[in-house]
Every structure is written in structure tokens, then in C-alpha cells.
Amino acid sequence: MTKTEARAQAKALRKNLDLHAIGAAMTQQLFALPAWRQAGTVFCFVSMRDEPDTTAILQQALVSGKRLCVPRCLPGNDGRMELVEITSLNDLQPGRYGILEPCGRTIAALEPGALALIPCLAVDKQGVRLGRGAGYYDRFLTRFGQTGPKLLLCPEALVFPALPTDEWDVPFTPGEILTENGVK
């Protein structure tokens, strides 16, 4: 299977998933984890319509007094993002691709120990992440070098036996995949 075929299969499967319910279950799983409770800073993607909903995660991070950073896509076609700290969900406005993006202060790097929550279209049991194909999160993870825990948020139905990979794909390891049923 090619990456293009895998993306098509993942997108087709997603259409039949209740992503709101899956997002709510993932959120409850996340809040029970020591990595969440211990994190002073959380980096989290702002979900699109076809992703598990991260709104409750963003809200709880703010209510809990955690420093919250979200990505902002940079202009151009080179798949770069920057980190932006927000202090309210009102700091989010529609940006590139119609994704809510922050209008807050850009920061240079995540502090050591920050928890990073990363999206995907699918993942395999070995931790190979399949994204949308632009390389935004592979570049992000390489550029910012994650020194704290990272979790890939993926519906259980999209954990495949195997996926194609390239040398630039940043792998995840067992224990770094969070589904609605817990950590894999």
C-alpha cells in the first residue's frame, strides 16, 4: 500500500466515525494520565472537522493553569509551523485551510517536559504516523526536538497493522499512541 492509498483508506474510514464521541473519550483517557497531570506546558493541535475534537483539551489546559501552545501554519508551501502561546480560546481565528489558528505571541521553543499532542490520519502498531502529506508535524517534531512526552491522538479504528514510511517520518513508540480506549 502506498501513502496515497493509505490516506484514502483512512479518510474513508473516518467518515463513519463519531469523532466528537471519540474525542470526548480520548480526552477522558488523557486527563487520567500522569503525563497530563505533570505537564506545566501543553502543545496541542486545534482539531479540524475530520479529527477527534480537542476543544475540551484546550479548555482544560487553560482552566488548569497550564501554559498552552498551539501551531500556526506559516505562509508558503514548505510545511512550516510556529509555536504560539494562547491564554484564551478567543485567541483562535480562522487561518490557512480554514483551521482555527492563534493570534497570540510566538515562542521560540517548548520548555523541557512539555507535553505534545500530535494529530494523524492513521498510525500503525509500530508507531509509523500517517499525516496529511505536507510534513508539518514531522518538521515540527524535528525542529523543536521534543524533550517531554508526546502523544499521537488516533481513533482506534485507524490503528493499522502496517503503514508505508519514509526516512523523514518521525516515528512514535509504544506508549505514545492515545486512542479512545487508552494508550497503545
Q: Predicted segment positions?
A:
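Short, well-ordered strand-loop elements centered on a beta-strand within folded domains, enriched
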Residues: 78-85, 128-130, 181-184
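N-terminal active-site beta-alpha-beta segment that forms phosphate/nucleotide-binding
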Residues: 1-111
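Surface-exposed, charge/polar-rich loops and edge strands
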Residues: 1-5, 12-15, 111-116, 124-128, ...
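Receiver (REC) domain switch-region micro-motif
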Residues: 42, 116-117
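Mid-sequence acidic-hydrophobic segments that form the walls
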Residues: 102-105, 119, 143
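Short glycine-rich anion-binding loops that position phosphate/pyrophosphate groups of nucleotides
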Residues: 48-50, 121-125
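Glycine-rich, N-terminal phosphate-binding loop of Rossmann-like dinucleotide-binding domains
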Residues: 46, 120, 179
